[in-house]
Amino acid sequence: DLSAAGNLPAGKLREFRMAACEGIDIGKYIKAGYDEEQLKQIRTALEKALDIDPYINPAQRGASIREIALGIGKNLDVKTYADEQMNWQQMRERRNGLEHRIDISVYNNRMYSWQQMREIRLGLEEHLPVEEYKSFMYTAKEMNKHRLKLMQEANKANDKNEETGKQYDDFTLLTDGKQMEAFIQVSAAGMKIPK
């Protein structure tokens, strides 16, 4: 019933009408004071049958509500990042961390900018020792430099391991740098050597 929408601004009226066409009632959100962008994200979430009510409030921007809906849609623990004191980019970094199954408690602090959170998250995804650069004293740009340096060091170590050998339970397979020759080094601990 659009008559209940009476004096709504055009944007809110459009969202009300679009929701009504889908059989969704967003009247309580309009009465609560949500703006047009928030109503759009709420309507979109409700169209997907996502239960966003426990996690949203009118103080959040539409983009924050979208991040919450994305997390619910992916069965993530939304309450770990649906923090009204964080901006939507910080919420996105926390959601991305949960999607990649990393421990977001390492950067779960609103004192980090979203760019700093991203650098820590990327380091965790790459299994780097982020403790070396996660200090608040580093800017996101400095964190990026530290992360890239750690990645280079890790790649060099991996390349060296590939050149020198691969460890198995009872022997080590050694190859030269060009992998043109291979040698097997047998471990006496794992083998029965006849006397």
Regions found by a protein language model. Give the residues of each.
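General marker for long, soluble alpha-helical cores
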Residues: 1-195
